Amino acid sequence: MANSPQAKKRARQNEARFQINKARRSRIRTFLRRVEEAIASGDKEAATAALRAAQPELMRGVTKGVFHKNTAARKMSRLAARVKVLG
């Protein structure tokens, strides 16, 4: 348990940041899931639109420190390759 005022404040800040990051991560995962669903349905136009919507969200997650930039780049690259293959 935090004893000093500073430690108590850090605990409060950590919890607040955790909740914010949790919401951001959930939002990004939702966008990525929409791309996955569009790919699974085989609809190239919907998949492309979903990918275009997901990319800025994922990059925003990088800017905010939720994801590492290489992780985001890898996810976008793999999704883009799968969308490109759709006929």
Swiss-Prot record:
Keywords: Ribonucleoprotein, Ribosomal protein, RNA-binding, rRNA-binding. SUPFAM superfamilies: Ribosomal protein S20 (SSF46992). One of its GO terms (biological process) is translation. It holds the Pfam family Ribosomal_S20p. InterPro entries: Ribosomal_bS20, Ribosomal_bS20_sf. GO terms for molecular function: small ribosomal subunit rRNA binding; structural constituent of ribosome. GO terms for cellular component: small ribosomal subunit. Belongs to the bacterial ribosomal protein bS20 family. Binds directly to 16S ribosomal RNA. This is Small ribosomal subunit protein bS20. It comes from Roseobacter denitrificans (strain ATCC 33942 / OCh 114) (Erythrobacter sp. (strain OCh 114)).
